[in-house]
Amino acid sequence: MIRSTRARRAAIVLAASALVLSACGGDSDDEPDASDSPSASETKAATKGDGVLRIGSLLPQTGDLAFLGPPEFAGVDLAIQEINDAGGVLGKPVEEFDADSGDGTPDIAGSEVDKLFNDKVDAIIGAAASGVSVSVIDKITGAGVVQFSPANTAAGFDTYDDNGLYFRTAPSDRLQGQVLGNLAVEDGFSNVAIMARQDFYGEGLADQVKATLEEKGATVADFVLYSADAQNYTAEVNQVAASKPDAIVLIAFEETTKIIPQLIAKGVGPEDVQLYFVDGNLADYSDESFDLTGVKGTVPVPAEIDEAFNERLLEVDPKLKDFSYSAQSYDAVMIIALAAIAAGDDSGEAIGAHIIDVTREGTQCSTFEECKTLLEDGEDIDYEGASGPTDMNDTGSPASGTIGIQEYKGNKYTQIDAVSGVVN
């Protein structure tokens, strides 16, 4: 079932407002004259929030994506700090509650969501892993709470029935898959093997890479999916090696540290075959004995590198070494806060009904204080964030995005190029 479009959301909100107004009408038989009735502009729909915007974070402190946690938490912390420095939301400071998303095994995320519910959060930032998010999306959105991920890229979220309460600031893997497939072909490779996690994230991205490679005339030497819970990857690595690829796309998480040595042992490691990583396994591997020099990878990045923004993040967390998804986390919080102001209500349903509106088709603004002033003056806004344009399509995902192309020298990577595009 495809999620509600913007028009349907508006209809739902109007219907709900009508029910609220009729329920509050009392038992009087006297109908007021039209001339005595206040106009729509003179009245406000009843609010459901308690006046305090509470935001929870469900981000990785442990698990396969723990390396992404620090920049994401820093983005959330910085946004809330700046919002509160500018007067908060609806006249009160935003409250923050942190939780651990884990990696889905065991089910850490579910119990952590319960803790956030006990904290009475109106919105949750997270999770980072698409597989974790899909495991809790029904629980969160079913409770009338906004779920807003800074890092989910699985294409499946675009058609997920989420009560109009799931959003993200990272572009769908339809874009990353296209960029990665094009990159391999442009690099001169025509017989590419794909090895990917068999989960909500891995399969979707692998399918998009495969489609792009074939569209560009390349052959997919083999398409190998492996269990995310596997203890070893011998059979899958043997299968990939047997296909004799000239390049390998490895769509993985932390298990990359186990797979690379096996690829090397079979003669298809980084020194023998061109390897490509993705956002899930682009990390600092300085503690590993293998050498990744020449390996390339893709990851959603801000439209432009903003050193001033990174400096502000370092003030929040001086230990930061990586800024992946920090801007997207920051923007997720900002958009939620601005949507609450636009709604005049901090409840999840009210925020969800206004999130898309504050990202497009209004007066452009880029700071919370500037955007807040415009909203309080009755203007529609188009928030331009730290990650770039945040314009959302009707599914609650970015309508466009930028994918950074990274390359390893030793076991650390640097950005060598970036490709921006519309998410089709």
Regions found by a protein language model. Name each.
Residues 2-16, 25-424:
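Extracytosolic ligand-binding ectodomains
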